[in-house]
Design a protein with these regions (language model features):
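Catalytic-core regions of core metabolic enzymes
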Residues: 1-161
């Protein structure tokens, strides 16, 4: 699922509503959220599925004059750097995802270059697969004579795999 928070087309359908729709769509396993500076649309979104947030237009913070649409000019603590921090806090990461420094969690990653989206999403989804595999092993270990769906072996009571 790909979501753009560009404020022009869906101005009354903000990121929290997209997050709600994502959570309730069984077909969607993850989302890419494309964000622009301006507005607090994304801050209150609560994601239950993995997300890669692409926060763009950081260069605007270096300008001495306002440019862009009204939402991008009207804000305060809603510039690109602030939005990056919001998502980093949500995902529990301490930096931006780049090929040189792939920072991500099972919850998500933050990129500023759209070219990094595929690699970031792949890393996040692999982290979720590893998490799911570990949970299956833990569950199978807790149940007597349970079959491990990952390795297809039987577990005997008081023994390992």
């Amino acid at each position: 699922t790909l979501v753009s928070s560009g404020k022009d087309v869906y101005i009354h359908y903000a990121a929290p509503e997209f997050a709600f729709a994502l959570a309730n769509d069984a077909r969607s396993k993850a989302a890419v959220l494309y964000c622009e500076p301006g507005g607090y649309y994304e801050r209150d979104a609560e994601f239950t599925k993995p997300v890669v947030a692409c926060v763009v237009e950081r260069w605007k913070s270096r300008l001495t004059r306002a440019v862009g649409h009204a939402g991008a000019m009207a804000g305060g603590e809603d510039d690109a750097a602030a939005k990056e921090r919001w998502f980093m806090d949500k995902f529990g990461v301490d930096g931006l995802y780049t090929p040189e420094r792939p920072v991500f969690s099972a919850k998500g990653a933050v990129v500023t270059n759209i070219a990094h989206i595929p690699a970031a999403l792949t890393a996040v989804m692999r982290a979720n697969a590893d998490l799911a595999r570990a949970l299956l092993h833990k569950l199978a270990a807790a149940l007597p004579a349970a079959a491990c769906p990952t390795c297809l072996s039987k577990r005997r009571l008081n023994r390992g795999w």
